[in-house]
Amino acid sequence: MPKGGEDVTKRVLFVCSGNIDRSPTAEALLRGRKGFEVKSAGTLAGAPTVASKQLIDWADIIFVMEEKHKEALKLLDENVDRKIVVLGIDDHYLKSDPELTRILKDKLSKHFGKV
């Protein structure tokens, strides 16, 4: 347990299908913020970073873009439900799309304050 004055880092994992657009955009929003260590991954085999049991174990909280991503992670770890938040963001945005950024900021601010 951290002693008074120590920083507590929250490890956050963002997951989408291909780890190309949605999850990297979300990762960029929190990257560099004090108190967060952030990674992103995809559920598809060809993703730059593929979701794994190791990443699930690393994360304190996992934000998935769609329900299907939650189901894919449950195949890797049946107990992952307790860590997952489904954001409900469909796959029709490009990386750093202003609308995607706005939606992510809105949804993430409910968990982390202003993003």
Which residues fall in each region the model found?
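Short polar/charged helix/loop
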Residues: 1-115
